């Protein structure tokens, strides 16, 4: 299987979103993810009931600025913390 060419300035990565108060924060998280649908490749959400926490993994393909804006808006939501790992522009380990 061949690798798709990477557009100039585009980065592939995963954004981990930890949601502490799902009932209050989920609508805002979903609204932000919808706003950035153009860079979202896919997402998977897991409710971790034992810790009263939800974890969402979001695969993104966008510029550093777009991904930074997405993570900034998500991280500004009360009860939400975010961490992104991006693929190096030329491949290899995440930076």
PLM features: residue spans?
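Long, contiguous binding/interaction regions
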Residues: 1-95
């Amino acid at each position: 299987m061949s690798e798709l060419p990477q557009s100039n300035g585009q980065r592939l990565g995963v954004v981990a979103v930890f949601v502490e108060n799902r009932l209050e924060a989920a609508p805002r998280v979903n609204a932000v993810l919808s706003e950035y649908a153009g860079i979202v490749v896919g997402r998977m959400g897991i409710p971790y009931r034992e810790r009263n926490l939800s974890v969402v993994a979001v695969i993104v393909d966008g510029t550093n600025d777009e991904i930074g804006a997405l993570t900034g808006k998500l991280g500004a939501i009360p009860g939400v913390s975010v961490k992104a790992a991006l693929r190096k522009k030329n491949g290899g380990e995440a930076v």
